[in-house]
């Protein structure tokens, strides 16, 4: 009712159209696509952080100054996440083991006609505990499931994930990683907060900061 969301039930193709519309509306409000071609039961939201005024409303910040103060406080006062037992976790109510093609259960998109494949850009990659020096790391990584249920993702040089890879590259020990979808907006924001390692060094608690940002522990 305040004009902060475009909600459409017009069919949109994840091949070029979703990202094309998003790009056309850069800097504006979020867009919720209710009718995704070839993906019944799926919805897609883009431009979630395209408008700083919408972001302020999303988190209850009065203005830009209030946002700066609240974010600074959250960075130095993380809230430990609340761990939910698997039997009680909503995300474990429906489990698909060994899927033949992971892309069937997500909405990968194609950005340009020059790309040979669809890309998953909405997954939030998570590494925690001893593999991140006792902390928690969230990040965006362009992902592709090229071989059914085997995926690859791009790691930016110097990023937190790059630090993890550098540490374990020659190790035979697998590094546990989860890729999460539909996470709270605070986690999505923290996933894009890397590369400033004076503020967020290796071993920091990004999930904890996300909890402080939203005013309650991430569950």
Predicted regions and their residues:
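Extended, highly charged
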Residues: 1-219
